[in-house]
UniProtKB/Swiss-Prot annotation:
This is Shikimate kinase 3, chloroplastic. Keywords: Amino-acid biosynthesis, Aromatic amino acid biosynthesis, ATP-binding, Chloroplast, Kinase, Magnesium, Metal-binding, Nucleotide-binding, Plastid, Transferase, Transit peptide. Gene3D superfamilies: P-loop containing nucleotide triphosphate hydrolases. It comes from Oryza sativa subsp. japonica (Rice). The gene is SK3. Its main location: plastid.
Length: 287
């Protein structure tokens, strides 16, 4: 990335971050789905293979990241912090965990961009693997358990690869087997206040959120209630991550009154800082 390009940040951009049919017994190989879906994000002039098992292409196609997420200063800091972190990563994958709507996909794409990694969204890979166009439809046609089984298959196959940033589904942390896969790389928890998540989800709708779409009533109230219940179930699991990125902490550091004015690049910078701290401490212990 050219850190010298004048790029303007979008206040509050984090709040808009994004996030086909088969039988329950016949399984489409996950490796095939990943290979077909691969859209690598690669920067730099001397990148090594992304790994062989899933055959992810490392072609230098444009990353397609909306550069308006960066200011020139943020772009420079991202570049510098990525250079600091890369030697400690040793090509290991990075897995982003956190509640639905926490910005894992957009922050993950930024991290992949500056690290020269490829990016994957595990939910999208499950959709490709089972041939169903959305997680909500998978839940409707099959079950949550069916989705979780395929999610574990995706994470298992990704764990054999290198140089990937993976945005996981909000519930991926509940299965211990998934942690055994993710711990082959490094894990980052994006910790977003539930109130901010509920407001964001209520604004965009719950149709794509199968765990939130059943109840009727005020969108914010039902989103907040369900998110609170889910977080209580998952909190200890999220805490297993190697690094925690607290958006409240970033907001305080930057003098924001709330997290909705943070840019995705500011969150990505904090993720790199936390990852560098964890990896350097780990290296010191080993030595």
């Amino acid at each position: 990335m050219d850190a010298g390009v004048g790029l303007r940040a979008k206040p509050g951009a984090w709040a808009g971050l994004g996030n086909p049919r088969r039988s329950s017994t016949a399984r489409v190989p996950v490796r095939f789905a990943v290979e077909k879906f691969a859209q690598p994000l690669v920067l730099g002039s001397d990148r090594r293979s992304c790994g062989a098992k899933l055959k992810v292409s490392c072609s230098r196609k444009p990353a397609g990241i909306d550069k308006t997420y960066y200011s020139a200063d943020e772009a420079l800091v991202l570049k510098q912090k990525a250079e600091d972190v890369v030697p400690y990563l040793n090509d290991r994958c990075i897995y982003l965990v956190g509640m639905m709507g926490s910005g894992k996909t957009t922050v993950g794409k930024i991290l992949a961009e500056v690290l020269g990694y490829s990016f994957f969204d595990s939910d999208k890979l499950v959709e490709k693997a089972v041939g169903i166009s959305s997680v909500a439809e998978i839940f409707q046609l099959h079950s949550e358990a069916f989705f979780r089984d395929n999610e574990s298959e995706v994470l298992r196959d990704l764990s054999s690869m290198h140089r990937l940033v993976v945005a996981t589904g909000g519930g991926a942390v509940i299965r211990p087997i998934n942690w055994s896969y993710m711990k082959k790389g490094s894990t980052i928890w994006l910790d977003v206040p539930l109130d901010a998540l509920a407001r964001r989800i209520a604004a965009v709708g719950t149709a794509s959120r199968p765990l939130l779409h059943q109840e009727s009533g005020d969108p914010y109230a039902k989103a907040y209630a369900k998110l609170t219940a889910l977080f209580e179930q998952r909190m200890d699991s999220y805490a297993n991550a190697d690094a925690r990125v607290s958006l409240e902490h970033i907001a305080v550091k930057q003098g924001h009154s709330n997290v909705t004015t943070l840019t995705p690049s500011a969150i990505a910078i904090e993720a790199l800082l936390k990852m560098e701290s964890f990896l350097t401490e780990k290296a010191m212990i080993r030595n």
